[in-house]
Amino acid sequence: MLYTVFCDESCHLQKDNSSVMVLGAMYCLSEKRKQIYSDIRAIKEKHGLNSHFEIKWTKVSESKIEFYLELLDYFWENSDLHYRGLVATGKDKLNHAKYNNDDYDLWYYKMYFRTLDPIIRQENEYHILVDIKDTKGGKRIQKLKEVMCNNIYDFNGEV
C-alpha cells in the first residue's frame, strides 16, 4: 500500500530561545488523501476561511476557535488519518560536539528518523513530505531516506 506522510516541525531552529522541539507526522493511505483534502477545505469554507488558509496552531484565536475545534473533531473521528509526534526536550542543553559531530542539523534529522521509523513498514511504500530546512536540507533528506531504507533492509531504496 502507498501512504502519504505529511511532516512538520515547531521550534526546530537551534537558537530560537526554546528548549523544546516538536516533530509531527500525519499520514494516510494515498488513495484517501484527496477526500481528506476536500473535507478539510469544506471545514475551512464553512467557517468563512479561504480554502487555502494555512492551518497553524499559532493562528488559533478566539475568532477561529470553532474552526479549530471542528478540525480536531475531524482528525479524531477520521480512522483514515494517523499521527505520530515526537517532543524533544532539553534542546538547549545538548552536547552536539560530543554526540553529533558538532552539528545541530545532524541531531535534527536524527529526531526525524525517531519520528518516522515506527511508521515505516517494509511491505508498504511511502511518499514523505518534509519541509526543507535550509540550503543543505535536500541532501540531508536524501541521507535520511537512505538511513530509513537501510534500517528496514531496503538497500535499493524502494520503500
Map each language-model feature to its residues.
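Phosphate-ester processing/binding pockets and catalytic centers
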Residues: M1-V159
